[in-house]
């Protein structure tokens, strides 16, 4: 899914926080979004994901609008955003909403838990999880629907290196297997170099030059 942003503007209280004339995220590529705090990175992902619909400009998804592709887009939030339920129930939730067969739900959830090393957490409640556990569950939940576009807001911020490696591997594996378009906000230049095919640099809501990062 190619995602194209045109003449995008977002304001809060009269102040422009995002002003992007033209930006294209290539289909099947992993794109890193970097920049200082307050640069508009999360705002951009919120708009692309459909969370924030109050903006000027256009966002196209391989020539379609959001209403036609919203079931194919999912986002992992910086703090997970899990429901107050068990790990299994969290991962299964989007599949249940879609009316997926119970046997398929069971198989999908078990496979994802195994892939992310969280099988032993199946019955554990979300509020009892560590930061690294929370992010792995959040990623599993996002991947359960097999999205064509996966948006990630600092998915490995402040977690142990071993969990970071597991999450990064899962992201890359999914991209290679599904050819999904993946956008990832990160403050780590090393992570951007490890994972990303392309880099977008945001500063004060505008796209800047990212030369020299690779």
From Swiss-Prot:
It holds the Pfam family ABC_tran. Its EC number is 7.3.2.6. ATP binds at residues 35-42. It is an enzyme of class 7 (translocase). Keywords: ATP-binding, Nucleotide-binding, Translocase, Transport. Residues 3-214 form the ABC transporter domain. PROSITE patterns: ABC_TRANSPORTER_2. It catalyses: tungstate(in) + ATP + H2O = tungstate(out) + ADP + phosphate + H(+). InterPro entries: AAA+_ATPase, ABC_SmlMolc_Importer, ABC_transporter-like_ATP-bd, P-loop_NTPase. GO terms for molecular function: ABC-type tungstate transporter activity; ATP binding; ATP hydrolysis activity. Part of an ABC transporter complex involved in tungstate uptake. Probably responsible for energy coupling to the transport system. The complex is composed of two ATP-binding proteins (TupC), two transmembrane proteins (TupB) and a solute-binding protein (TupA). Belongs to the ABC transporter superfamily. This is Tungstate uptake system ATP-binding protein TupC. The lineage of its organism: Bacteria, Bacillati, Bacillota, Clostridia, Peptostreptococcales.
């Amino acid at each position: 899914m190619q995602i194209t942003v045109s003449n995008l503007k977002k304001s809060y209280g009269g102040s422009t926080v995002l002003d992007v004339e033209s930006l294209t995220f290539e289909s099947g590529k992993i794109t890193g979004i970097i920049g200082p705090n307050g640069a508009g990175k999360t705002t951009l992902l919120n708009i692309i994901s459909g969370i924030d619909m109050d903006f000027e400009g256009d966002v196209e998804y391989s020539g379609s609008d959001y209403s036609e592709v919203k079931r194919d887009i999912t986002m992992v939030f910086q703090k997970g955003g899990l429901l107050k339920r068990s790990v299994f129930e969290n991962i299964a939730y989007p599949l249940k909403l879609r009316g997926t067969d119970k046997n398929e739900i069971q198989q999908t959830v078990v496979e994802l838990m195994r892939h992310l090393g969280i099988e032993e957490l199946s019955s554990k409640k979300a509020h009892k999880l560590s930061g690294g556990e929370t992010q792995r569950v959040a990623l599993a939940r996002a991947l359960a629907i097999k999205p064509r576009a996966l948006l990630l807001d600092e998915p490995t911020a402040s977690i142990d290196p071993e969990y970071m490696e597991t999450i990064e591997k899962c992201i890359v594996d999914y991209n290679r297997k599904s050819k999904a378009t993946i956008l990832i906000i990160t403050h780590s230049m090393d992570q951007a170099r490890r994972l990303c095919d392309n880099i977008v640099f945001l500063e004060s809501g505008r796209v800047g030059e990212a030369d020299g990062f690779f």
